[in-house]
Each structure stands twice: as structure tokens, then as C-alpha cells.
UniProtKB/Swiss-Prot annotation:
Chief location bin: membrane
Keyword line: Amino-acid transport, Cell inner membrane, Cell membrane, Membrane, Symport, Transmembrane, Transmembrane helix, Transport
One GO MF term: neutral L-amino acid:sodium symporter activity
Source species of the chain: Vibrio parahaemolyticus serotype O3:K6 (strain RIMD 2210633)
GO CC aspect terms: plasma membrane
A Pfam family that the UniProt record links to this protein: SDF
Protein's name in the database: Serine/threonine transporter SstT
UniProt key word Ribonucleoprotein: no
Membrane topology, from the record: Multi-pass membrane protein
Subcellular location: Cell inner membrane
Length: 405
């Protein structure tokens, strides 16, 4: 009986506070017993694995069900959300350019990133994304190819739009059932994050990051400017309301989880649950959240721009204003295609370095630096990317609701 009451109290507890407790205990365990801390990393891996496993099914079922059950003349607000995604990514690249010029970083380059193959150009990235669009639906689910999943989900939803009410009800019930499983997995987040924090501190530590403190400061500074200045400004522009309650809630409930899972895909169920909590339009967020995990890449744009300009300053190359603006555009476009590249934003750095005539050997050494600081860079990048998906979706939904009142 006491066991049941403990479980009930845990289930009713504040999830964010429970996650913070998990973080503290993870750091303590890594400090006291690194060997045991590495062992509990298994819990973190299981948590991330569970999120990654449920996310493709969740997206496919939700998208198909929401489109199939959409009423006539019912509008979704995808166009303004996509515009905000693209604007946010470009502004992120621009912020990184400004900070990189104000506080130029000089790197000590020694070795390259072995076994990594960067894309040859924008055309290759677009080609990869197009082929992901027409992927086999079963393979798309197995490989967690969200572009393919979205395409097939939308296609099936449109096909089912004229199906019988019973068939539509089955898909609606399926979406509710999958959502229940997601809520159960999210309740286990404190244990998962405890394992992730403990193993990260035990295996990596932060001594390796000390020599790259300046580079990290520029990277994280640009990300904070986007998260705390630019994103709130965009939300205020759309809603004409104080943006900070929404921004802080999204950073707290989406950003913290994304920071430790380091996976936009794994954070899709968390974002879906947050959108439901914010009472947003399900037909909109069921599409905008998985799409955002694919193309809304403000953090990736910052990483590409900052590390490319670090290489530029290290090589002593002069950069004029127009080239810097061109870099912002290239970084923004490349970042939107980061999901189409194995290794994500870091392997798009050679593409941006090509603008300045920097050799592939030097560019791959910069990529190696990116891998060294990845424990912080990748975590912060994912937290910014993922929380921004909800922020922009909420801003547009609330703006459209105000217009309709």
C-alpha cells in the first residue's frame, strides 16, 4: 500500500523539480564514484532509446489522424510557423557572425576528425532531403526519417479524409493511445536524466573543455541572445503580449530535457505533450513540431557560423560585410538541411569553410574541435532548437486565436 502511495506521489509531483533532483544526484554520483556513474548511464540510454522508439510512431499516427479528422474549412497555421522557423534560423546565424567579429576566436589546430565525410555542397544536401521525402514508409519509421514520416502521414491523412467515420475514429483512438504511452515515458525523465548526467560527468568531465572556454563562450553567448532576446522579440511581434512566461516555460519544460537527451527527435514527444498542456491547436502542432525538429535549426546555424569564423580568424583571412552576410545565408540554409547529414551541423562546417577557400584538411580539424566541445555544444544546440519549435508554434497559434476572437 505504501509502495502504491509513493508511486502516486511521484506521478503527481512537479516534473521539472524531479528532473533538477535527478541532475543534482547525477553530478554527486559522478563526483563520488565515477565507475558506478558510468554504469547508471544505462538508465539514461534506455530513456533516450524509449523516446526515440515512440517518436516516429507518434508523429505518423498523430499527423495521419489530425488530417483525416480535420473538419472542412478548418485551417492550420503552418505557413507563418515555417516563416518563423526560417527567420529564426537566419537571425541565429547573423547573431553568431556579430559575436564572432566582436570576440574573434583563434584555434589551435592539430588533428582532423577521422572517418567523417562532409557533404560536397548544398546540392548534395538538397538531394539527400528529396530522397528522404520519397523513402519507403516502413523504412522511414525504422530509420526515424521524419521528412519521410511527415510526407506519408500527410498522404495517408488526406486519403483517409473521405473514409468512414469508424475508420477515422480508429486513428483518433490510436493517437490517444500512443499519447498515453508518451506521457508514461516522459514521467520517467528524472531517472533517465539522472543516468545521462552521471555518465556524462564520469566519462567526459569538463577538463577537456577548459582550453576551448573562449569558443564555448561565443557559442553559448549567441545561443543565449537568440533564446532570451531574439525569440522573445519574435513572439512579442506575433502576439503583442509579454513573451517571457511562454519562453521560460518552453526552456524549462522542453529545453532542459533536450539538453540532456541531445536529440531533437527524442524530444518530439516532450514537445507534443507541452503543446497539449499549452492548449494549442492539435492539427497545427502535430505537423509543426516534427517539421521543426527537421528544419528549425537556430542552434545548428550558430555552430556552423561560429566555428567557420573561428577557422577564418585562425587562418588570418579578411572578411568583408557582404561575405559575412552570405555566410549567414549559407549557414541558415545548411542548418535547415542538417537533418539530412550524418553528424549534423558539425559536418556542414567544411561546406561553409569553402566560402573562404579554406582547405578540407583545415576544415576537418575544426570539425574535430567541434566534437571535443560537443558535450556542451550539442546539448545547448539541441535545447535551443527544440524549445524554439514550441515557442514559434505557440506564438502563431495564439496570434491566430486573437485574430479570430
Amino acid at each position: 500500500m505504501q509502495h502504491n502511495s509513493l508511486v502516486a506521489r511521484y506521478a503527481r509531483g512537479n516534473l521539472v523539480l524531479q528532473i533538477l533532483v535527478g541532475i543534482v544526484f547525477g553530478i554527486l554520483l559522478a563526483t563520488v564514484s565515477p565507475s558506478h556513474a558510468e554504469s547508471v548511464g544505462l538508465i539514461g540510454s534506455l530513456f533516450v532509446g524509449a523516446l526515440k522508439a515512440i517518436a516516429p510512431i507518434l508523429v505518423f499516427i498523430l499527423v495521419a489522424a489530425s488530417i483525416a479528422n480535420q473538419k472542412k474549412n478548418q485551417h492550420t497555421y503552418m505557413r507563418p510557423i515555417v516563416v518563423l522557423y526560417l527567420m529564426g534560423t537566419f537571425f541565429a546565424a547573423l547573431a553568431a557572425v556579430v559575436l564572432s567579429f566582436l570576440f574573434p576566436t583563434h584555434l589551435t589546430l592539430v588533428t582532423g576528425a577521422e572517418g567523417a565525410t562532409p557533404p560536397q555542397g548544398i546540392a548534395e544536401i538538397l538531394r539527400t532531403l528529396l530522397f528522404k521525402l520519397v523513402d519507403n514508409p516502413v523504412n522511414a519509421l525504422v530509420e526515424a526519417n521524419y521528412i519521410g514520416i511527415l510526407a506519408w502521414g500527410v498522404g495517408l491523412g488526406l486519403a483517409l479524409h473521405h473514409a468512414s467515420a469508424t475508420t477515422k475514429a480508429v486513428f483518433e483512438d490510436l493517437s490517444h493511445s500512443v499519447s498515453h504511452i508518451v506521457r508514461f515515458i516522459i514521467r520517467l525523465a528524472p531517472f533517465g536524466i539522472f543516468g545521462l548526467v552521471a555518465s556524462t560527468f564520469a566519462t567526459t568531465g569538463f577538463s577537456a573543455l577548459a582550453s576551448y572556454a573562449h569558443l564555448l563562450a561565443v557559442l553559448l553567448g549567441a545561443m543565449m541572445i537568440i533564446a532570451l532576446v531574439v525569440n522573445p522579440a519574435i513572439v512579442f511581434f506575433k502576439t503583442k503580449q509579454n513573451p517571457y512566461p511562454l519562453v521560460f516555460q518552453c526552456l524549462r519544460e522542453s529545453g532542459v530535457t533536450a539538453f540532456f537527451t541531445r536529440s531533437s527527435a527524442a524530444n518530439i514527444p516532450v514537445n507534443m505533450a507541452l503543446c497539449e498542456k499549452l492548449d494549442l491547436d492539435e492539427d497545427t502542432y502535430s505537423v509543426s513540431i516534427p517539421l521543426g525538429a527537421t528544419i528549425n535549426m537556430a542552434g545548428a546555424a550558430i555552430t556552423i557560423t561560429t566555428l567557420t569564423l573561428a577557422a577564418v580568424h585562425t587562418m588570418g583571412i579578411e572578411v568583408d560585410l557582404m561575405t559575412a552576410l552570405l555566410l549567414s545565408v549559407v549557414a541558415a540554409v545548411s542548418a535547415c538541411g542538417a537533418s539530412g547529414v550524418a553528424g549534423g551541423s558539425l559536418l556542414l562546417i567544411p561546406l561553409a569553410c569553402g566560402l573562404f577557400g579554406i582547405s578540407n584538411d583545415v576544415a576537418m580539424q575544426v570539425v574535430a574541435v567541434g566534437f571535443i566541445i560537443g558535450v556542451i555544444q550539442d546539448s545547448a544546440e539541441t535545447a535551443l532548437n527544440s524549445s524554439t519549435d514550441v515557442i514559434f508554434t505557440a506564438a502563431v497559434c495564439r496570434s491566430e486565436q486573437q485574430k479570430s476572437q
